[in-house]
Amino acid sequence: MGFLHGLISLLLGICIGAECRNPRAARQVVGGAPRVKLPQATVEGFFDLHNNTVFLGIPFAATTGGPNRWRAPQPVPPARPGTVFNATQYGATCPQAISGALYTQQDEDCLNLNVWAPAKGSNLPVFVYMYGGAMVTGGSSNPQLQGQNFARKDVIFVSFNTRESIFAYPNSAELGKTESQNFGILDVEKALEWVQRNIAAFGGDPNHVVFGGHSSGSVQVDHYLWNHPQTKLVGAVQMAANAKSGPAVAPTNQALDIVATEVGCPSGAQGGQLECLRKVNLYDFQTEKFNTTYNTWFTPVVDNVTRFQDYEGRLAAGKYASHVPLLTGNSNAEGAIFGLVYGAENSDFNAWLDTFDADVAEIPKDLLLAAYNVSDYASVSAMSGAQYGDARFYCPVDYLRDLRSASQDTWTYRFFANYSVGLPVPGPTHGTEIPFFLGGNECFDAIEGITETEQALADFQNDWFVAWIKNPKAGPGWGRSTPKNGTFAKLGVSGNELAIELGATGDYNGICQSVYNPYLPEYPVLLDVTAA
């Protein structure tokens, strides 16, 4: 069983239901509109209410439709001389399960990015942000992911789209023989390549780029560090997750055959499958079963090009960007929301552990059954959600921190602020911290009922975060992480929200150290989707 539409949004820490509004980025008219000349075209944006320049929907690659469906991202076609690209509206959202009003309209011409920058400045630090959504959903037009708070503090903020689910990770037997078919990961690389080549035109320093993300966005950050050991990034932010967080992987062509049958195309064994599937309208993929279940089966394959099985061996061989300072951490109740997200399949804990979504095949089941007691939780679903939080978020962060912190400057946080920011469970759960790290203000515009106290916390969080982005090597204001048991920052602690308290990771990682971490070197294990 997969994601329901509203619950997909919960994974991103965004507003839902009646609390949701979807405003365009705030703007004002100030004389002539700002223009930036790029090799692909001149782009024209607008000034926001703080006189920052904003450019939305700039293509960083060609359309992914037609013959480019299931190809690596292709270069942007050159524009005619004198072309001025209108960058005042968000671009299309990449195709994904279910269509809705939260993001812009879906279209395969979706590899676009957004830039917020001060009106004046040069050689400014750059923060590139990647949204989350389990690699099956999400988009940079999410109203909580605006960059005004960074531009006001002389940091250029960039967000971008990637392909999702079946369009990003088809896991096809026809592909992957000579190059990676993890197209979503390749999209990330293309976006960062664009930033390196073009951000100076917006006043940014291509030699001072920090790449960060939340949930699957931070998994993408980690893939980039593993795939580019010599990267010029000066900092990385992994909020909640990393390369050991998943997603799960199905056998080659298994998921694609099931979807192909639904849309009237042959199986992989019959031949001509991709040729047929390339002709299917993107909305025709959105069958009821695809939207509720199948969409989660399409995830990055272990190709040992863009996703690896032996990260431990790569680290030992120096094939990881250990020179890049890393900020990582979690909210204090990551799993709470997942008791709802997977509520249709997690009320039987024993059965839940066998599902594709739980994705814990590498861990002996008896250990997992012994590690959780339903009397400690409000329901079996709540216990299953907590287990999911351990498996996907807390323990991967703990495991790779143990592995890497001896050779990589690493700082860890834990977010305690008890605010729901539109989520239907008490905070802080998965995604709660996002609008606080991004500084609130416009990032809170889509959520009703935000208090002055919440904005004060967002100001505090964003201030130290921006200071770290400007000088990652100096650290964020607390001690570096160490393996097993070390210092971490407690953020948003009740009664002392506008301060950073210190804690010890050893007070929180017991179940990771004893149950999960010993088996994470074996992750991922192929999972049969027909048994999900």
How should each PLM-predicted stretch be described?
Residues M1-A26, A532:
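Fungal secretory targeting signals
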Residues C20-F183, E448-Q461, I469-P476, G510, ...:
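Non-catalytic accessory segments of hydrolases
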Residues S99-A101, R197, A201, H208, ...:
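Substrate-access "cap/lid" subdomains that shape
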Residues C110, E179-A200, Q254-I258:
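Alpha/beta-hydrolase active-site loop
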Residues G121-V126, K153-I156, D205-V209, Q230-G235, ...:
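Loop/turn elements at helix/coil->beta-strand transitions in domains of secreted/extracellular proteins
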Residues G213-G217:
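Gly/Ala-rich beta-loop-alpha elbow adjacent to hydrolase catalytic centers
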Residues S218-Q230:
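Short glycine-enriched nucleophile-adjacent loop
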Residues Y394-A532:
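Mobile gating loops/cap/lid regions near enzyme active sites that modulate substrate access
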